[in-house]
Amino acid sequence: MSTIHDVLARPSPEPYLSWASHGPNVYSESWLPVSEWTPWVDFTIQNLTSTYAQVLNAHWSGGDPQSIGISGRFDLLVPDERSLVPVAIRERRAASIINLGQEPLGLGPGSFGQNIASPDLGLFSVPTPASQEKLDILLPGLTKLSTKWYPEMRLSEHQSVRSEWALPLSQVSTCAALSDCRYGFLITDEALVVLRFTKKRIDVSGTQSGDDSDPAGVVNVELLPPEYAVIHMSSSGKDNLTVKLAVFCLCLMASGGHDKLDYGYPPLSPDDYQP
């Protein structure tokens, strides 16, 4: 019988960009500026499998493992970014195969989010109809075509290319700041980029004031350059970090009581990160 890790170690089929659109990324002056990022050094296969060993070694109970992923060539056709959203959400069953014992969760379209930098998709807490509580985003994400954005754009000698690289990061950083989310991600037809955000300390002469998050749409918190890790769609095998495994573990982090922004975080280990 397959374990959860066995299923999540399978590769994610790469979408087929037959008529993929080109052009600039969206922009808003209200977004937080991003000009740098830094490697998320402890987001590794070794740390994740150690931290979540009990979950990952459990028997797979999500039905036919072959249903996780995409099989038909037509399903892989991605002419624009909107078409990439359902492709990315096909991985959502990997985020819902265990009961976290708290509130229901769902990985779905970002139209549920309501702020100046709404994500394309994300992990949401789903309240019961009787509770009348709002739908809270725990993990904001953006979809981008590799014809418009890829991580290596940061290394370009052209300022215009580096500026385009920064725009999606500014958008998801702003969404994270407004929603008080510690984690986020960007997913393209070629790779998943996981992100962790950290608040910047402001001295007494700084201008930061008020609440750290503002649902009215004004960002009242400053962030350090985001930490990132890149996982390619072609990655597979239990010794490697795959897109499915990375999404699964990121959802565990965001829903396990370690989802709020802070000024620093403990190393990724079983002692500090348990669902």
Predicted regions and their residues:
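Eukaryotic intrinsically disordered, low-complexity regulatory regions enriched in Ser/Thr and Pro
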Residues: 1-166, 198-275
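Internal, well-ordered interaction modules that form the hydrophobic cores of assembly/scaffold domains
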Residues: 161-201
